[in-house]
Amino acid sequence: MATPIYPPAGPYETGFLDTGDGNRVYYEQIGSPAGKPVVSVHGGPGAGSPRRPLRAWDPTRYRVIRFDQRNCGRSTPHGSDPAADMRLNTTWHLVDDMERLREHLGVERWLVSGASWGVTLALAYAQRHPDRVSELLLQAVMTSSRSEIDWLYRGAGRFHPEAWERFRAGVPEDERDGDLLAAYVRLMESPDRAVRARAAADWLGWEDAVITGEPNGVPGMYSDRDVDEQIAFVRICAHFFSHGAWLEEDQLVRDAGKLAGIPGLVATGRHDMGCPPHTAWELAKAWPDARLHISDDSGHVGSESMMRVVRDAIEEFKDR
């Protein structure tokens, strides 16, 4: 079936959600106010929602809600500000923000869509609030287990040894054989902006290297942002992953049975170097209503064939 790509749609409403602890979460609504509600969960953590208009969602049938997770994008305080308190930014703070946003916008149930880190947050939310989720649409699957995090920031270095050596060299010499993520956290909490900026550039150089070597990899995908955005992204990312995203090991796969009755698509790339397809496979086995698609011509970014599968699911879900 030929899946449509719709005319660009921008927001019809923007606003800020006051979380009650000094944070303000930016959100926007796109499409039809009377449409089927969707919440789009961005990656990173710390990347912020994309600024580009939506094309895959029918703006006459869907009400798409995008938001910037704490301390990134247009949410305040921004993570580039050393005064932003990272102790108030955890997976479970973000889950609570999503539920608070749903209530604020008067949504009964919504389709939850996420990619990469957004899959982790989408699953954490859906497993805590399954009665509020109509469907799940998950791409480039990552559940932020310790083993996945260790693969991304250590194991993948077997394929990119020169880039990983540069990443490792970004921390003080006496910390290079220890916990690299904790070392980067310390650098990102430095009062010296130059130290934070250098560490952010080193971290994002590694992320770029991993994705550039994949099919359809985009050079500069992570580093192509201004310095404040780089600092916020890496500060948040290092903070989350050094804490194992405040999840028990394999928690989101282990508890996937809580999603029974929620239909969903699990779409991932066969050649995803950062988030290998094993996790998507295990998740789909544990989730009774999941449909798994592994795209043979995709990495983390995806491909046109994978996007067709995703758009088919979007078209299917709008009629449920």
What does each model-found stretch correspond to?
Residues M273-T279:
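Conserved alpha/beta-hydrolase "acid-adjacent" motif
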Residues W92-W110:
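Conserved acidic catalytic loop of the alpha/beta-hydrolase fold
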